Amino acid sequence: MAGAGLSVSRAAAADKVTIALIPGLTADGFYVTMHKGAEAAAKALGIDLLYQGAAEWNVSLQVPILDAIIGKKPAAILIAPNDKTQLIKPLKKAYDAGIAVVCVDTFIGNGVFQTGSGEADFPISYVASDNVLGGRMAARALAKSIGEKGKVYVSNVKPNISTTDQREEGFKDEMKKYSGIQVIETQFNDDDANKAAAQAQAVIGRVSDLAGIFGANLFSALGAANGVKAAGKRGQIKLAAFDAPESITNQLKDGTFELTIAQHPAEIGYFGLVSAYAYATKNPVPTAIGTGFTVMTKDNIDDPNVAKYIYKSS
């Protein structure tokens, strides 16, 4: 199990611990669901949970929120850093103030912590999905759906975001196994679904044998889908998504998407909080905790064991 090796008990009221969670952004079902998982752990362990984030994925918005949280002096901060390089120094301020740092979903540096080397070594743990594996899973499923031939591309946010970088890496590496498939240039959309839609229409206009698109995050996938529909190619160009809010899963049911890779964000939030609490109460903490995936398709989305991983909207 993902949290194996973590052993903690509920705090007495006099020893109540405060831990903060800063999501990548608040307006995303993934982080809403992560927050729910963290709340469940906080309730179970008697923790005061602070939750604050920006409405969009933006370093210049996340850093002031981080600074404000540091000023409240929690025992630990769980954070999904908006950039793996630009958040190193701001998070080092938390560490220097005696606040433990746990990276959830995204990471700083190379995501390998507590090794004794490097400027981004100080977080105590990284709790997340294996995003390279997730990208590979998307590639395998998309390759099958297009008959292992044709051109595909990745619709992505921007470089230097750890998770989406890794999803693209895994996708492209896995696609090398299919000689009949050519991966063409990635389209970066700055997390703007409208831009992703326009890019999809432009690629469709110039690549006559485009067979599929992999949307590496929510807005990349939604935008690509809108572009495909606007071009009149729904069902002809196969779409693979990453993440599972209802805005994606409803379009699995109607055939717009072939599949989506659902992460388990509630587990990330839960085990992230447990890790931070374990450290604050002087218990051992693994430096990395992995959570799983569920591949969702039109054929399995109504299965309760699959549907339970659809992200919460509120």
Regions found by a protein language model. Name each.
Residues 1-9:
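N-terminal export signals
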Residues 12-314:
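A residue-level marker of the well-folded mature domains of exported/periplasmic proteins
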